[in-house]
Amino acid sequence: MMPDRRSFLAYFSGLGLAPTLFPGVLWGKLEEEKTASVTKEMLRDAAAVAGITFTGEQIDRMLEGVNKNLAHYEELRKVPLDNGVAPPLYFNPIVPGMKIDRAKRTFHAGRPPHATRPRNLEGAAFWPVTKLAELIRTKQASSAELTEMYLDRLKRHNPRLLCAVTITGDLARRQAREADQEIAAGRYRGPLHGIPYGVKDLCAAKGYPTTWGAAPFKSRVIDKDATVVSRLREAGAVLVAKLTTGELALDDVWFGGQTKNPWDLSMGSQGSSAGPGSATAAGLVGFSIGTETGGSILEPSGICGVTGLRPTYGRVSRYGAMTLTWSLDKIGPMCRSVEDCALVLNAIQGPDDLDLTVQEVPFNWDADLDIRKLRVGYLRAAFSNTRQSAQVDANDAAALEKICSLGVKLIEVALPEHSDLDIGIIIYGEGNAALKDPVETQPELLVRQDRVTNQNALRLLPAVEYLNAQRVRTLLMQEMARVMENVDVYLVPFDYGDYTPNPVATMNTSVTNLTGHPCVVVPHGFNEKGDPTSLTFVGKLFGEAEMLALARAYQNATEWHLKHPPLFVTI
């Protein structure tokens, strides 16, 4: 049987010859001869055309390896591999010698805010979880009432925003009814009990389609709950919608169109956690769950003006969620306040024995932590990098000034030496394997045809180069550990990508994803067009509590997170 072109080229990729013409020329010779094996003459001819010289001994050795491996690759490709099958190699962001605080302390939430039910319950659509929870706890509103309010808003506004793939009305009503019965019986589970939320459609929810934003999976039902979904159910939360993801976790375009930014319907919401960013900003859910590999929580949160938390790698189980990159994927909350993010993280974090990268490190949240005791850095090179928007620069400067006014002294920090490591080598190297089947089996159904082209090209990524990129990543992690020895948290301007470029901020997003450090993005003003602007906080590995405490103090001293897109506000 003649091998296919991909398995043939894979052998030369492993030899480091993929970037040359040699593999392609040799494949052409193989097709021309209509044979299933390679001959010495074919190797010599292909080498000559490619401008490479091999000795007779090298050709003899290569010939045996080429033909032997062709058979191995062909057999390997016959093995069905579900996206959920992970390699037995687990990334750990902790470097040798690093000390992690594993002592568990009491979870200390902030004092519940005063909440009075508005005459029109839709007036609570933009309330944070902490305030919605008070309505439920004090029995001023039922979970069923809040659920119907959010379901109605989803049905009315989703046609404009394209932020929900599936509205889970039947499930939501059942869960809300159960929550109300438990609360009436005195079994209150905590601040998420009865709160309606949405989850990015990379996460499985039993009984409903999990589409990954891709047309080939429009009707595909994964008959299990992702760990984040089951843990939120245990906390009493109510699932009202599967929210959009960019196709196969890329950008904000999916098979139904482009998810819109509630602040400006001519713009996309960014991605790939496009639906969570849009729906949370528009007041269509109480909170949402997003995922990130290289910016997919931070970017839509910042663009849509919500508070987005990307936890430490290994904090939250990815079980039941689509894999893009085993060593980079993370799951986290997208909310309307920092305190909300802390409450949701507390519910979803910790080992489940299903995702072996998750570590047993307690989340010791203390809403009243004295932030004056924190060592706070700022990435000077990023703040010194003037953008195309004077207003964004002014907002960054004002945020630093406000944080200093809270009794914090800022320390200059700089990114590590190997910060220019291309995260794409790892994302696309692993993603090419993880998403091989949907891209190869029904490529004509994908919205992003460039994804197919890239997938084919990246079959030629040499294994040696991928592994060496991971080794450079180790150096980067060690360097970052030294940076974080001097600070508990550091501040960075938000990475707006092409909107208002800041190369250092963009590099920070890449670096902290590679090293696994947590980040939270919070609103800090508006630009000249009236679109939200944001600030990024970076914490130590498993140091979300300190990072969120500083972000909460900043948020409480400002009111930017209380601003909402006028098109979706109901008086």
Task: Annotate the PLM regions.
Residues 140, 145-151, 177, 364-365, ...:
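Acyltransferase
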Residues 133-134, 371, 384, 417-420, ...:
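Serine-dependent amide/ester hydrolase catalytic core
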Residues 56-61, 65-294, 401, 406, ...:
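Gly/Ser-rich catalytic/binding loops embedded in alpha/beta enzyme cores
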Residues 156, 234, 281-380, 397-406, ...:
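Structural helix-boundary/capping segments
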Residues 1-3:
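N-terminal secretory signal peptides
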Residues 7-28:
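N-terminal export signals
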Residues 111-123, 193-212, 370-380, 411, ...:
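Short helix-loop capping/hinge segments that flank enzyme active sites or metal/cofactor-binding pockets
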Residues 22-64, 81-88, 366:
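C-terminal segment of N-terminal export signals and the immediately downstream linker at the start
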